[in-house]
Amino acid sequence: MHKIIDSGRKRAVKDTATKKETLRFIKWLKKGKNVLYAIDQDYGIKHSKKINFFGIPTYTITTAERLQEITNCNVVFLDSWFEEGVLRINLEEISKNNVIASTEMISQRIESSIRRNPGEYLWHHKRFKSSLGKEFYKDAR
């Protein structure tokens, strides 16, 4: 499955990096390149903070803010949705606050986007597995 996903991504972008290749992101950002990073993933507890997501304290990665601290890059929230068959895109710069405030702000933007168009959110990636446990998803099959 990873090969299929990676192949699709490489058709649309110049290069990809895995969650374990943060150094590649840092190099790209220091060179002034743009990076798209989906921060609403659950990569576990180690590099996460508990942030409310739909009222549930949820482990949320803080990588975007850490990359901002290291490279002084801008963090921009990209929201996209279809409206009457037209792709709409909204970009919003996330201010350089502290890690928790920035992560909370991004989580709030994701919540708003999901509330507007819940059918367009990628629900299958188990967003709550570190917070609620993997058992939470066993009945969802």
Where are the regions a protein language model picked out?
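Conserved nucleotide-cofactor-binding alpha/beta core module
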Residues: 1-33
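Non-catalytic C-terminal accessory region of glycerolipid acyltransferases
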Residues: 20-141
